[in-house]
From Swiss-Prot:
Region entry Disordered, spans: 1-34, 155-354
Recorded superkingdom: Eukaryota
Pfam families attached to this UniProt entry: Eaf7 (PF07904)
Organism phylogeny: Eukaryota, Fungi, Dikarya, Ascomycota, Saccharomycotina
Official protein name in the record: Chromatin modification-related protein EAF7
Gene: EAF7
GO CC, alphabetical: NuA4 histone acetyltransferase complex; nucleus
Length: 354
């Protein structure tokens, strides 16, 4: 009895020890497993990139395990290291790898599976076209305007108060009526400026025209006086030839007075020409070509025709008697002194007192 009891006790103790050993080994195995919630999450993330199914499943497994180890490489020293076999064992507990290989093979060879059921074909096509699926997007035809309104509302909320102030200033800017009024005022000012320019141009043209006519009259008058003086000098010289001394003095005085009048007329003509040139330059600087037409008119044949009477007068003056011509040739020309032009002596009457 005792022995029996001892044997029973020993048998029960042996069974309990075996259970404890098995439990200890199980706990140690679970503790040494590299898989955790974080590692499984990284595994599923890598499965989305590298699918170890089909002909290239081993190459994809290399990339998958490398992705796992790279993620944990920056962790502390006790970070887990995953081998290819560890990953295959974990996937074998989660999926039917043989069934997935068959489905992948069927998807690659759809032409050889035409005799299968419609349900199987639909499942195979869904698996084969999984990579071609597009992300769901709301149709723009129905929801596009709502999206635009929401985007503009968010943008307006994020805008700075400075921008809002600038927009308010722009909105409170001048109205359309004020803009039209401003444009009309600008047009009036420009038209006034144009009118002023036209008036100034007209005044300048009339001034140039009057000066040109005055200069022509003075030139004509100076030449006529010179011709008349020459014509009147001829009978006087004829009378003065009766008395040699008196004739020589009167001839010198007349020649000197003629030279002085000629020099005065030349100086006056030079001053008028300079004034005329300055006025023409001012008008030319304003960018008008009307002054040129006035100057062209002055140099036209009609203006030249005004010198015809002078030529006829000169011809008449040159047609003088031979006696007076010889007397004029005999009379000596007046000599100028070094001090300047000699003043004319007072004219003496050549008529004899009766």
């Amino acid at each position: 009895m005792v022995k029996r009891e001892d044997t029973d006790d020993t048998s029960t103790q042996a069974v309990d020890g075996a259970e404890v050993e098995s439990n200890g080994q199980g706990d140690a195995g679970t503790d040494s497993s590299p898989w955790s919630i974080e590692s499984e999450t990284v595994l599923f993330n890598s499965l989305c990139k590298f699918k170890p199914v089909g002909i290239h499943k081993h190459f994809r497994m290399i990339s998958l395990s490398a992705s796992l180890n790279y993620y944990f490489s920056e962790s502390p020293k006790d970070a887990p290291v995953f081998s290819h076999q560890d990953v295959w064992d974990k996937l074998g507990t989660l999926y039917d790898l043989d069934g997935l290989d068959e489905l992948e093979y069927v998807a690659d060879n759809q032409d050889s599976d035409m005799d299968e059921d419609e349900d199987d074909e639909a499942a195979i096509e869904g698996i084969a076209k999984r990579s071609q699926m597009k992300e769901f997007v709301l149709p723009f035809r129905d929801y596009g305007f709502l999206q635009i309104e929401q985007a503009t509302a968010v943008a307006s909320e994020q805008s700075s108060p400075a921008m809002s102030r600038e927009q308010s200033v722009l909105e409170d800017g001048p109205t359309a009526g004020d803009e039209k009024k401003g444009l009309a005022d600008d047009d009036d000012e420009s038209s006034d400026l144009d009118e002023l320019d036209d008036e100034e141009m007209k005044l300048a043209e009339t001034k140039i025209k009057v000066e040109g006519e005055q200069q022509e009259r003075e030139e004509n008058g100076g030449e006529e006086e010179h011709d008349t003086m020459e014509g009147s000098a001829e009978p006087e010289e004829a009378e003065k030839s009766e008395e040699e001394g008196e004739g020589e003095e009167s001839g010198e005085s007349e020649s000197e007075s003629g030279s002085e009048s000629q020099s005065d007329s030349d100086a006056q003509t030079g001053r008028q020409r300079r004034t005329r040139a300055a006025t023409a330059a001012a008008v030319r600087g304003r960018g008008t070509s009307k002054g040129k037409t006035v100057r062209d008119k002055k140099s036209s044949p009609s203006t030249r025709a005004s010198s015809a009477p002078r030529r006829s007068t000169r011809r008449k003056a040159t047609t003088e008697p031979e006696d007076t011509a010889t007397e004029r040739e005999e009379t000596p020309t007046p000599k100028k002194s070094s001090g300047g032009v000699k003043k004319p002596a007072p004219r003496r009457s050549t008529r004899r007192k009766k």
